[in-house]
């Protein structure tokens, strides 16, 4: 796809709420990233999928190979290729929220891996609406199967020697969640917090007041060195966002 086509797609179909459109353009123009690294004893890969440049994450214990996939929004075969290349046994597929660009690959990935799907109870109704929602933007997505379990504030999910904590951050959607790995010092923020921006709040269940309040009280209180990996665009840190994010008083 050409750069002009990508610019047109973003500018015409995704409103520039809180700078998100510009953030997405930067992601897409960088091309389809598929980056991998080991963070201590953990395999960590970012797989950019779909025309909206969603960051899908593969996390796994480097010894036991138990792992999770977060937000397989599209291009399930690309996600499954990363799973296979790393020899990962996927225990769970987690959705940060239920918007179509983050859930479009749920069905294929869960069917191929046998992983249990998890999403918040508030956002679960979106799972059966992905195809219809995508057509509103001239795109396509598969409806998702129902979840095996619901995510809620304070839940802990283990894979190998690693553990993530669920943090409920409403505002981009009613049931938006972030995933915090304290030992590894990283946060998967979905579409709640971006590099020097926040998620759009003009969709059903959205509220800028709720979103900003939750980010300030639940995310900006994490250690400043915590690395933040958002649903679109480049990584950042809690310290950087406290200082420079204009939507958070930075």
Q: Predicted regions: what is each one?
A:
Residues 3-18:
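Bacterial N-terminal signal peptides that target proteins for export
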Residues 18-27:
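Bacterial N-terminal signal peptides
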Residues 39-86, 178-190:
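Conserved beta-strand hairpin/beta-sheet module of binuclear metal-dependent hydrolase folds
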């Amino acid at each position: 796809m050409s750069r002009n086509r990508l610019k047109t797609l973003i500018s015409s179909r995704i409103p520039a709420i809180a700078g998100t459109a510009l953030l997405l353009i930067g992601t897409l123009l960088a091309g389809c990233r598929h980056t991998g690294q080991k963070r201590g004893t953990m395999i960590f890969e970012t797989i950019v999928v779909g025309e909206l440049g969603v960051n899908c994450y593969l996390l796994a214990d480097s010894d036991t190979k138990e792992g999770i996939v977060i937000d397989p929004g599209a291009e399930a075969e690309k996600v499954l290729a990363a799973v296979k290349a790393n020899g990962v046994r996927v225990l769970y597929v987690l959705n940060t929220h239920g918007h179509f660009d983050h859930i479009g690959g749920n069905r294929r990935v869960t069917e191929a891996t046998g992983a249990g799907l998890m999403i918040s109870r508030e956002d679960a109704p979106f799972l059966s609406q992905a195809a219809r929602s995508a057509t509103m933007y001239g795109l396509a997505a598969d409806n998702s199967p129902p979840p095996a379990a619901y995510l809620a504030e304070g839940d802990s999910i283990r894979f190998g020697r690693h553990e993530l904590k669920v943090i409920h951050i409403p505002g981009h959607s009613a049931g938006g969640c972030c995933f915090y790995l304290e030992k590894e010092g990283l946060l998967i923020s979905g579409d709640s917090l971006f590099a020097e921006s926040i998620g759009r709040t003009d969709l059903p269940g959205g509220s800028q007041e709720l979103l900003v309040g939750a980010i300030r009280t639940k995310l900006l209180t994490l250690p400043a060195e915590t690395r933040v990996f958002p649903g679109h665009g480049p990584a950042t840190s809690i310290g950087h966002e406290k200082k420079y994010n204009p939507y958070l008083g930075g």
